[in-house]
From Swiss-Prot:
Residues 118-137, 451-465 have a biased composition (Basic residues). Residues 95-173, 407-426, 443-465 are annotated as: Disordered. It holds the Pfam family DUF851. It comes from Caenorhabditis elegans. InterPro entries: DUF851. Residues 153-173 have a biased composition (Basic and acidic residues). This is Uncharacterized protein C45G9.8. It comes from the Eukaryota. Residues 138-150 have a biased composition (Low complexity).
Amino acid sequence: MRLLVCFGFFSFTYFFSRKGTRSYFRWVSTETSNNTRSKCHKLKSESIMTTSLLSRMQIDRDLRRSTEHVEIVPQETCVHHESPDSVLTECATMSTSTHVMPNSSSTISKSATEKKTKTGSKKVTRSKKSKKTKRRSSTTVTTTTISNSKPVTPDKDKDSKDQRKQRTKRKDPFEKEWFGKECDDVTRCKVPIQEFKIAEVQLRPRIEEDQNIEVTSRDIDEADMERICKKFAKEKINPITMAEPIDEKTKILLDRVTKKPYPLKYNNEKGLLLFDERSSFYKSREKKKAEKSESNLEEDTYGQVPKLKDVQRLPPQNVFSRPGVPFWAVTLLPTEEDLVDVDPSISVGTEHLEMYHLKQVPLQTIKKSKLILNALQPLSILEDRDDIHFTPELVFSNTIRSLVHAQEMEGKRNESKSDDEGKSDKSLSFVIEKQEEFIYSRANPIETARMARRNRRSKGSSSKK
């Protein structure tokens, strides 16, 4: 019994000691590994910080040295000089389009680098993002070298601010660069666009160009002439009754006639029209006593004298007459002096058209000729054309032609309207097919319907024969 108890105790201690040592060693190993990792991260971050700070300090020193005496020459290599006098002597062929930065770029770079180091130090303290900090630090170094690699000339520090403003200033949309124009300076000349528009766009002539016109006469169609004559014949057969004009006496009588009729009295018992009572419509009015009116002197209104605004509109002061129309626009009848050497007016009507249809009146035609119309032709040339194109015989014949053509146009319009109305008035016909009807018995509907159909078909075939 004692042996068994001892054996169990020793086995339990052995097993427990083995398991405990394993867990203890595991705990110690994990703690040491974490400590070593944190130390490594700290060392790496400190090394990165020292390298980034040293690199930035070196870049700032290089920039200070380089910005003392450096100039940019277009399409040439940059040259380092020891003194500003040598710059003027050796680099005399400089272009005016070089971009110059102020001497305060070193201070700007310092402030920028300080800000960047602060942000970088905050990022480095985070041990979990060590790899990201490495990449960011490398990118910041490269960006600083690119951004601050613009050397500055010491001779043009005063004009640097103006040039910076010119670069930042937006281009005016109303300006255009013109290199062909000669200027005092070598700089580009800026000229407004309006000057170019005036120079480039060709001014259109206000006066229209000459027009070549051919003068001809249009012949009359005989079919249209016959149709017009038939129309006039129908109008003669069925003349339109026109109301005769009223005489002056009848007008006076119509004005005196009372417009209000007298009221009619009906007998309530029989309902018959009896007579008119004047007294019932016109009520008797009591005569008022004539009041004594005192005689008052009335002031003169000077109604016969024209007003000042009408006087100011008279021709010497103003071209407008009293109704507000200029004096040259007022229609005036021609005087006897105006009618001298003027042919009497000729009225053209249906009678002349019938005479032309019966070939009693010949129409005069003008020869085909070409004219050049110009707005600035002399008056003598225009007056010479009156004897050719405006003779009384030619004007008469042209008016008859115009009447026929006008009637032709009206006839075509009426025909088109009648066609449209006829199309709309046409009656619509629908073909309705009669459905077959059968009488069948409810006891045997199918067979009875078939028998009825056969009988109908046999009757139809016999009737056709």
